[in-house]
Amino acid sequence: MFHKATALFESLAKNHAFYNANKRTALACLEMFLLYNEYELKMSEQESSDFTVNVVEQRLSFEEILKIIKENSSQLPSN
């Protein structure tokens, strides 16, 4: 699941699918994908912004992005 989340996030952030708001859209999609799979991204607004910029500027490999997403995600409690 985390590999799919990373692929979605990286692709949306780097490939400029939209005229504007690619970084915000990529982050929102990552958060929604994680929530759909009962996980929550635990990053401050500044941390998530810095992380997304680092991805877009190709400062992180796929494996590094994956590791950061895993380390900053927590499973939601089951009902």
Predicted feature residues:
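C-terminal domain-closing interface element
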Residues: E64-N79
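N-terminal alpha-helical segment
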Residues: A5, A26, L30, S44-S48
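Short, conserved aromatic-histidine micro-motifs
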Residues: K42-E57
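Amphipathic alpha-helical segments in well-ordered regions
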Residues: L8, L12, M32-F33, V55, ...
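Helix-hairpin-helix/helix-loop-helix acidic hairpins
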Residues: M1-S11, N15-A17
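Active-site beta-strand/loop microenvironment that shapes enzyme catalytic pockets
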Residues: L12-E40
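A structural-propensity feature for long, helix-poor, extended segments
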Residues: N54-I68
